[in-house]
Amino acid sequence: MDKFQSYLGLDRSQQHYFLYPLIFQEYIYVLAHDHGLNRSILLENAGYDNKSSLLIVKRLITRMYQQNHLILSVNDSKQTPFLGHNKNFYLQVMSEVSSIIMEIPLSLRLISSLEKKGVVKSDNLRSIHSIFSFLEDNFLHLNYVLDIPIPYPAHLEILVQALRYWIKDASSLHLLRFFLHECHNWDSLITSNSKKASSSFSKRNHRLFFFLYTSHVCEYESGFIFLRNQSSHLRSTSSGALLERIYFYGKLEHLAEVFARAFQANLWLFKDPFMHYVRYQGKSILASKGTFLLMNKWKYYFVNFWKSYFYLWSEPGRIYINQLSNHSLDFLGYRSSVRLKPSMVRSQMLENAFLINNAIKKFDTIVPIMPLIGSLAKSKFCNTLGHPIGKVIWANLSDSDIIDRFGRIYRNLSHYHSGSSKKKSLYRVKYILRLSCARTLARKHKSTVRAFLKRFGSELLEEFFTEEEQVFSLTFPKVSSISRRLSRRRIWYLDIICINDLANHE
């Protein structure tokens, strides 16, 4: 961000940002490309390498200066005479760069707010595993959970209106409207519950799509923080740090001023100091220690709140109230639940002995094996029944590359699923990947799997050791039982910031 600010000469104290002229500057395209934000966008057309990509940008800007209707006009033909490129290519270039430009004031306000509030930025909060450690610490004391799909705006114009709080440049907002209406399937962008939400527009314009989604989530979650602070005697102090990635510092004060009078008389019905919120992959969880009646009140209160004040559409029938003691949460590759673990205690008083049954709540996380096998089958490591098959397209690689690829895939999966309470699923994955690796190598050398395993079995075994197993074996070389017991423990890593494609069953 400092690199952006030095190029653009923007001062954090400025109240208005005129971003539209930056679209006509060559260096903003080069900076975005070099910064790694979208390295492939200018190079996707065949026949153009790194040296000629800047030429495309220069001629694009020249055309924008010279023509009134530009190359992005709806009346343009799909194929432009200029360099033989079609309109969609230039639309893609400009939409990606425009999204980068519009992120500048948001990022600057975020950094300024962090410094003003003295919030220490922690990368550990970005870890996916931090969600599960949070659930492990808090869900044992809760009773009910609301499964809430994130509501979507009734019209795309609402997304643009939400950005007016951050972006004061009207021209940039008009350009954003143009990109949204230019999309042929733009209605699917706002329906987050649809499998087709990643339409042709979102596939070609990932950064703009995520920018709009982030601003939408910002608007949606700011209401949660306000209601949480208003309904509890203990004000939330850590919410700002936990939500630092979605850019709504300063929004809380604005909401407090606007909505305080409207809700002050009603929120006494919802006093609940034990409300916890988690968001993941277009869905969210709201857990509470309250009763079923209280959760039902929250459910309809949120539906009317989103509809009346944010113009967000949510279907009450898709919001489910579940009791944690008999409900499992399936998300991010884990199946999480709170189970009652029976415990028997023997108590003796004088000559009489008593057996007392106690039920202890335990947070349990397992890896569902069938969705994981489905992901492996989709990637051609096994069939739908879980029987390993060779990876034919890797047969032309060297032996070391093949073994390294299979070993790395297993280590990544094992690292991500290290928080599982039961490791049986991971042993099944190791078996599938090891045998798939052996079949691939046997096919390459025109040999049988049995003969190949007999020759290279020990080498394959070493490649499929995880980091934890290596550490345990080095620490306890002679005590194998301790090593096995430690390797079965649940471990959460705070360096995992993205979900593995094979682990993502959504």
UniProtKB/Swiss-Prot annotation:
It is found in: Plastid, Chloroplast. InterPro entries: Domain_X, Maturase_MatK, Maturase_MatK_N. It comes from the Eukaryota. Transmembrane segments: none annotated. GO terms for molecular function: RNA binding. Keywords: Chloroplast, mRNA processing, Plastid, RNA-binding, tRNA processing. Pfam families: Intron_maturas2, MatK_N. One of its GO terms (cellular component) is chloroplast. One of its GO terms (biological process) is RNA splicing. Belongs to the intron maturase 2 family. MatK subfamily. Usually encoded in the trnK tRNA gene intron. Probably assists in splicing its own and other chloroplast group II introns. This is Maturase K. It comes from Jurinea cyanoides. The gene is matK.
